[in-house]
Design a protein with these regions (language model features):
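Acidic, low-complexity central loop/insert segments
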Residues: 5-9, 13-16, 59-176
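Short, surface-exposed ligand-recognition loops at beta-strand->loop->(often short) alpha-helix junctions
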Residues: 16-21, 36, 106-111, 233-240
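Glycine-rich, small/acidic residue-mixed loop/short-helix segments
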Residues: 54, 193-203, 213, 217-274
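Short, intrinsically disordered, mixed-charge
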Residues: 27-35, 77, 81-89, 116, ...
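Anionic-ligand-binding alpha/beta catalytic cores of soluble enzymes and soluble regulatory domains
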Residues: 138-229
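Glycine-centered loop/turn motifs
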Residues: 40-41, 116-126, 238-243, 274
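Short amphipathic beta-strand starts and helix->beta connectors
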Residues: 1-2, 43-57, 87-88, 124-132, ...
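Acidic, proline/glycine-enriched N-terminal capping motif
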Residues: 1-57, 61-64
């Protein structure tokens, strides 16, 4: 990523959760430990099915008396509905602020040039009252600015950055093996732990129970992880969703995301594969 560029990620949506029971509510649902999320630290997490299958993933940022969830926009309405199903009588308010706030990405180098910035995944600080986060999944993916739409142009000028197409950012994310687009195609098809969430700092195996915890822990503790979500490159032709992948006539996986930045669930033929 170029130090002088900024990428407005219009594919991201924003939920804001607050209320008397908000910490307990999130802690009982998601894969990471919400107690770790502070004004200066944000984390990556996911919401799974009771069987441990993937549903949603997001970055959680502390904001005022609640939490911001930065999620793929095409999934935001479904995530909003799912959280409201779990809410029941909890004193929790869930707001969709996707039309008011946006997410913009800058390079790690630009982030570290800002005053008081630290080279730590998830490190969070304020820039003109807006949160800016060094990506908790992989700091090489740069930092994310969660900002009111009306303030975006002013901040871009003040930071002396050039706006570029988000495709450059997503291409780099694909190279790093982090799926951020068309993640709805993963729903109920793949275990959360197969999405590399442990490697992306998205699962805390020491926290208490959460939705899907039993299967996730079993796969981890019994060393049952034999498949992973990996980026693939199309050399020729076209990819189809659920298309099988072969190596020397042996089926090793299938395509799950077949769009511009494709991913496939790949089996390990070698247990020592890193």
């Amino acid at each position: 990523m170029n130090k002088n560029n900024i990428y407005t990620l219009e594919d991201r949506g924003i939920l804001y959760l607050q209320g008397e029971n908000i910490l307990e509510f999130l802690q009982n649902l998601i894969t990471n430990d919400v107690n770790k999320v502070k004004e200066n630290y944000s984390c990556f997490a996911s919401l799974l099915t009771p069987q441990g299958k993937y549903l949603f993933d997001f970055i959680i940022i502390k904001h005022k008396n609640g939490y911001i969830l930065d999620c793929e926009k095409k999934q935001i309405d479904q995530l909003y509905k799912q959280l409201n199903i779990y809410k029941l009588r909890s004193k929790v308010e869930i707001l969709n602020l996707s039309n008011e706030f946006t997410v913009a990405a800058i390079s790690k180098e630009k982030f570290l040039s800002l005053e008081n910035a630290k080279d730590e995944p998830g490190f969070t600080m304020k820039y003109n009252e807006d949160s800016i986060i060094l990506d908790p999944r992989n700091k090489e993916l740069g930092a994310r600015l969660i900002i009111n739409l009306e303030k975006l142009d002013h901040s871009i000028k003040k930071l002396e950055l050039n706006s570029r197409e988000s495709s450059e950012y997503y291409m780099y994310s694909h190279k790093l093996g982090i799926a951020q687009l068309d993640t709805d195609k993963l729903q109920n098809k793949i275990f959360g732990i197969e999405c590399n969430f442990e490697e992306l700092n998205g699962i805390d195996f020491k926290k208490g129970c959460y939705v899907g915890q039993e299967n996730t822990a079993r796969i981890k503790l019994k060393n049952k992880l034999s498949k992973r979500l990996l980026p693939i490159k199309l050399v020729d032709g076209e990819l189809s969703e659920d298309e099988k992948i072969f190596n020397n006539k042996v089926e090793i996986g299938k395509v799950l995301i077949n769009e511009d930045y494709p991913f496939a669930l790949i089996k390990f033929l070698d247990k020592n594969f890193n």
